[in-house]
Amino acid sequence: HLMHGRPLSYIEQIKDLKNIEYITIHLEIEENIQNILNKIKEYGFKGSLAIKPNTDINLLVPYLDIIDRILIMTVEPGLGGQPFLENSPNRIKEIKKLIKDKNIELEVDGGINNQTINKVKDVDISVVGSYITTSDNPAQRINDLLV
């Protein structure tokens, strides 16, 4: 997940690495998204777009035939430990409608913990950070998420 406004130079630097499957760029970047997604595919990676909480989901539409995954940010990106944004489940539902006939995975990142995990149960991947890493008992926190 490249949290950078101009990710192409980073992609060029990692293009020969073999242990990377997906490259995620933000929909809100300064560079031409289509060109970057084409480069990602050209280098043999799967392409993924991250979308911030307040970005119009319809901006994803032009890229739905080329991307393999959408990362829905459930907090404003950039700072760990933020609370889960309560409108996120509605955004997930709306994005699921957009991709209903597509083979695109959905991922969420931000504010995921034992209280919010059930609100995102309809996605393929949930990224959990601070809830686990700030705990004195990370194994218990992981188990709490699996219930």
Write out the residue ranges for each language-model feature.
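N-terminal active-site wall of soluble small-molecule enzyme domains
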Residues: 1-39
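Hydrophobic faces of well-ordered beta-strands that scaffold small-molecule active sites
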Residues: 2, 21-25, 47-51, 70-75, ...
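Catalytic cores of alpha/beta
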Residues: 8-17, 55-66, 108-126
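Generic structural signal for well-ordered alpha-helices
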Residues: 11, 33-37, 57-60, 89-96, ...
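Glycine-rich phosphate-binding active-site loops on the catalytic face of alpha/beta enzymes
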Residues: 23-31, 71-82, 123-142
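Alpha-helix-loop-beta-strand connector modules within alpha/beta enzyme cores
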Residues: 39-48, 88-110, 145-147
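Glycine/Thr-rich beta-alpha phosphate-binding loop at enzyme active sites
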Residues: 53, 61-93, 97-100, 140-141
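C-terminal alpha-helical cap/extension of soluble enzyme domains
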Residues: 103-147
